[in-house]
A protein has these predicted regions:
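Short, acidic/turn-prone active-site loops that include or flank metal/cofactor-
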Residues: 20-24
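Conserved helicase C-terminal RecA-like lobe
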Residues: 2-15, 27, 34-173
Length: 173
């Protein structure tokens, strides 16, 4: 695993390059996991929202995301708040409404788990991966790439043990 080397090089300020591969924290599955955690920690993180709102697939397409953006801009809201308001005002197609509602409700549940300290940051990510369907998405597509992605996520969970809480982990990445 390259993560440990990357962490050490970053810590001592030594420049490095990964040949023939992608840096650990730049891998799609790691970015997805971090995006989930960032959005749970800070609902105003629109970049994280965009990355994960339809990952795994929730029937939330580009046109819906465009509508959310326009509504957010018009009403001076972040994307999550805009989504909530759009759901309340029935401004979302029925098929999309189901997926978006589930996503918003899940975020709320995960935040409550974190706030009420029902789960630490490591357990929280495990819960998110299971409840969001992200783990199932990777497991259901049997190929070497997805097996590697699952291994990378295990490595991320292991790396998170070095941090006392979600805030310190997010500051690090």
């Amino acid at each position: 695993q390259t993560r440990e080397f990357e962490e050490r090089f970053l810590k001592i300020g030594m420049p490095y390059r990964i040949l023939g591969g992608t840096k650990f924290y730049e891998r799609a599955e790691i970015k997805d996991c971090v995006a989930y955690l960032r959005l749970i920690y800070q609902e105003k993180d629109d970049l994280a929202f965009e990355r994960i709102v339809n990952n795994p697939k929730r029937s939330i397409g580009d046109s819906t995301l465009k509508n959310i953006h326009e509504f957010a801009k018009l009403n001076n809201l972040n994307l999550e708040r805009a989504s909530i308001k759009m759901l309340e005002q029935n401004l979302v197609k029925p098929k999309t409404k189901i997926g978006l509602n589930l996503f918003i409700n899940s975020l709320s549940k995960w935040r409550n788990d974190l706030i009420l300290k029902k789960s630490n940051h490591i357990k929280l990510l495990q819960i998110v991966l299971d409840e969001s369907g992200y783990s199932a998405m990777l497991k259901n597509k049997k190929d070497v790439d997805n097996e590697n992605r699952l291994e990378n996520i295990k490595e991320l969970l292991s790396a998170m043990k070095e941090f006392d809480n979600l805030e310190s982990f997010l500051e690090h990445v």
